[in-house]
C-alpha cells in the first residue's frame, strides 16, 4: 500500500482516554498508535512505556502528568491525551489543560463499571466533554456473551444517568493488549472499528473563527481626537471595522458600540480574528464608561451573570495552595479572563469543608455580574495567589 502523504487539510480532533485505573487506558492508547500505523502507515507507533511515564506539566500553577500522542486515520488527525493517575485526570479536565472534543471511555469487561468510571463520566459532563465512545476492553478474557451484554447495559445506564445518550453511544468490544501484541489480528480489526465509530460519532469541532465574536477587555486608553481604544486578545470569531458589538458585564445592561477602527502592531486592519491581539477604536464611548473585565461581543451572543455552579479543584499546599480547608460561605476572588470578582461559595449539602487537593461541585454567587458561560475556566485567588482552579458547569442566573 502506498504511503499516505501527510496533509494538513485533514480535520483535527482532540481526544482522550478516560476510565477506571487498570482498565487499560494506556494500553489502548499504545494499541491505537501501533494499529493505525500498521494498517495505514499513518502516524507513528508509540510504546506503552513512553506513554506510561508521562511528563509532568504545569498548567495554571498545578502540576499535572499527561501523555500526549498524535495519530491519524485516513479521514482525520487526532491529538490524544492519556493521564497516568486519577488525580491527573481530575486536574486535567477541570483546568482544561487538555481540551477534549470527545473521549474514549475504557471499561474492563472483567470488572464492569467501577468508581472512577462513574467519576470520569460525571467530570466529562461537568466540564463539557461533548461526546463519549466506549471501548469494552479485555474481552479476550470473557467467554460469556451474556456477561458482556450485562456490562454493556451497565455502562449505558451510567452514561444515561449523567445525561449522555447511553442508548445511542457506540460501544466497541476488544482487547487492547491483544491488539498491541498483533495489530494484524482480529483484535487489531477492533481498533479499526473503534476509529470508524469515532470518525463518525465525534464531530470535528467548530473552529474558533467561526464562533460569534468575543474579546475580553484588558486595557483602555483614549486617543485625543479619535476616541476610546479597548485592547485585548480576540478569544473567538471575527471583528470587522464598522461592526456594531456589545459591551457586556459590570453594568446594569449591555451597551451597543460601533467599532470604527481595528489596529494590530500599530497597523490598521480591516478585520481581526481569533488569536489576534488588537486595539479596537470605539465610537462615542468615554474612557470612564468602559473597564477591564468587560467583554466586547457580537450583539446578543452573551449575557452577564452572577450565579452559577462550578466544578473546582483545590490546590494542595505543595502546589502553592492553601494549608487549611475552607468552609461554606468562603469569599475569595474569582479570576475570569482578565479580571477578579469577589464571590461567595456555597458547598453541596452534607459537605462541611473542602481540603486542599479535593475536587468539589459548588455554587458561586458573584458581587458583580460578568460574562460567564458553561465551560469557561477560571481561577480562585486569595491575595493574588491561585488557590483553586475551576470550570463553569451550569448558569443559575
Swiss-Prot record:
Places the protein is found: Cytoplasm
Binding sites annotated in the UniProt record for GTP: 19-26, 82-86, 137-140
UniProt-annotated stretches for the region G1: 19-26
Keywords recorded for this protein, A-Z: Cytoplasm, Elongation factor, GTP-binding, Hydrolase, Magnesium, Metal-binding, Nucleotide-binding, Protein biosynthesis
Transmembrane segments: none
SUPFAM superfamilies, per the entry: EF-Tu/eEF-1alpha/eIF2-gamma C-terminal domain, P-loop containing nucleoside triphosphate hydrolases, Translation proteins
Residue segments, region G5: 175-177
Classification via PROSITE patterns: G_TR_1, G_TR_2
Region called G2, residue ranges: 61-65
Region (G3) residue spans: 82-85
HAMAP family assigned: EF_Tu_B
NCBIfam families: EF-Tu, PRK00049.1, PRK12735.1, PRK12736.1, small_GTP
Family: Belongs to the TRAFAC class translation factor GTPase superfamily. Classic translation factor GTPase family. EF-Tu/EF-1A subfamily.
Protein role: GTP hydrolase that promotes the GTP-dependent binding of aminoacyl-tRNA to the A-site of ribosomes during protein biosynthesis.
Protein name listed in UniProt: Elongation factor Tu
Species this protein is from: Clostridioides difficile (strain 630)
Gene for this chain: tuf1
